[in-house]
C-alpha cells in the first residue's frame, strides 16, 4: 500500500498539485489496490474513511438530488467511491456514477477504475468497446494489458 500511495502522490502532483487533489488520488489508488487484492467493500470503505477522512455514509439516493458539477476532489472522489460501493457489477457501477449527474464523466472514470479492479470488465463489454478502437489504440491497449498481466 505504501508504494501505491507514493505513486499516486507523484502522478497527482503533475496535474492536481494541491493537498486535496493528492489526497483524492491516493484514496482512489488505495481503493483500487484493496479491490485488486481481494478486500471486501466493507474493508475498502473503512480504509478510505479512516485513512483519508472521507464521509462515505450518504447513499447515492441522498447525494443525487443536490449534486451538481463540482471540480473539487472532496466533492467528487467520495461520491464516486460511494457509487462503486453501492454497485452490484461493473456496468451497474458506471450507471450509478453517471446517474449522480454533475461531472459525470469524471465520476464514471473514478468509479469505473475501482469497479474494474473489484469486478473485472465483462467480456462482451470489452469486445463491444474494442470494435471502436483504431488499430493503433488496440495495439496500445494490448501492450498495457500484457504489462498488467505480468505483474
What are these regions (language model features)?
Residues 1-7, 47-60, 80-92:
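Acidic-glycine-rich active-site phosphate/pyrophosphate-binding loop
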Residues 8-14, 27-33, 75, 80-151:
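Catalytic phosphate/nucleotide-handling subdomain of diverse soluble enzymes
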Residues 20, 41-44, 107-108, 124:
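Flexible, glycine/charged-enriched surface loops at secondary-structure junctions
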Residues 1-19, 35-43:
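Inter-helical turn/loop segments and adjacent helix faces that build the functional surface
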Residues 25, 29-32, 36, 40-68:
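Small-residue-rich helix-loop
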Residues 19, 55-58, 137:
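Short, surface-exposed, polar/charged, turn-prone segments marking secondary-structure boundaries
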Amino acid at each position: 500500500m505504501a508504494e501505491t500511495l507514493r505513486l499516486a502522490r507523484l502522478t497527482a502532483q503533475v496535474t492536481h498539485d494541491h493537498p486535496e487533489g493528492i489526497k483524492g488520488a491516493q484514496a482512489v489508488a488505495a481503493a483500487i489496490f484493496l479491490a485488486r487484492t481481494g478486500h471486501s467493500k466493507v474493508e475498502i470503505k473503512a480504509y478510505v474513511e479512516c485513512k483519508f477522512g472521507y464521509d462515505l455514509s450518504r447513499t447515492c439516493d441522498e447525494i443525487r438530488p443536490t449534486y451538481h458539477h463540482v471540480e473539487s476532489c472532496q466533492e467528487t472522489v467520495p461520491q464516486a467511491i460511494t457509487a462503486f460501493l453501492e454497485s452490484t457489477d461493473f456496468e451497474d457501477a458506471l450507471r450509478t456514477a453517471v446517474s449522480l449527474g454533475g461531472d459525470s464523466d469524471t465520476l464514471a472514470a473514478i468509479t469505473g477504475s475501482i469497479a474494474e479492479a473489484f469486478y473485472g470488465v465483462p467480456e462482451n463489454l470489452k469486445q463491444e468497446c474494442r470494435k471502436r478502437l483504431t488499430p493503433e489504440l488496440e495495439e496500445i491497449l494490448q501492450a498495457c494489458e500484457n504489462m498488467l498481466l505480468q505483474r
